[in-house]
Design a protein with these regions (language model features):
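Formylglycine-dependent sulfatase
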Residues: 2, 18-163
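Sec-dependent N-terminal signal peptides
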Residues: 4-14
Length: 163
């Protein structure tokens, strides 16, 4: 009995200490068509100082697998499951990292290509700007650009110059 009380005491203490600790900011970057050796932090001769700084001060993946289809890798990164386990592009099984972080009172946002079912705001992201299609012109856009669920028209010019 004393052992049980002792364990419960330290468990409660650990939870108390953990709740007082400052939560980390989480920035997760996934880039299509970026090879393993394209960043300086992975040994490339290409200089990528800002990404190298993020990698040096944070967590970086050193063992990962990328499928030949971009949506499969995105589904796995979002859910921690194999693409088929998560329901493929439908994401109808399991929870996304945005849903889990949202339950922990994190603010979640996604910027860029979605190329999965529905919209990112349907899967836990509180804010979204990007395009829903698999590929588009960032100069002319298409009808799938969204800002928080609303259709977004890509401007033809910015400050009088081509955008």
């Amino acid at each position: 009995m004393k052992r049980c009380i002792f364990i419960l005491y330290f468990l409660a203490l650990a939870v108390s200490i953990a709740s007082d600790a400052k939560r980390p900011n989480i920035v997760l970057i996934m880039a299509d068509d970026l090879g393993f050796a394209d960043l300086g932090c992975y040994g490339s001769e290409i200089q990528t100082p800002n990404l190298d700084t993020l990698a040096a001060e944070g967590l970086r993946f050193s063992q990962f697998y990328n499928t030949a289809k971009c949506h499969s890798s995105r589904v796995s990164l979002l859910t921690g499951l194999y693409c088929d386990q998560a329901g493929g592009a439908k994401l109808d099984r399991g929870a996304t990292i945005a849903e889990v972080l949202g339950q922990a009172d994190y603010f979640t946002a996604m910027v860029g290509k979605w190329h999965l079912s529905k919209e990112p705001t349907d899967f836990g992201f509180q804010r979204y700007w990007g395009h829903l299609s698999g590929a588009t012109s960032f100069f002319k856009g298409d009808n799938t650009f969204r800002f928080n669920g609303e259709k977004y028209e890509v401007p033809e010019t910015l400050n009088g110059r081509p955008f």
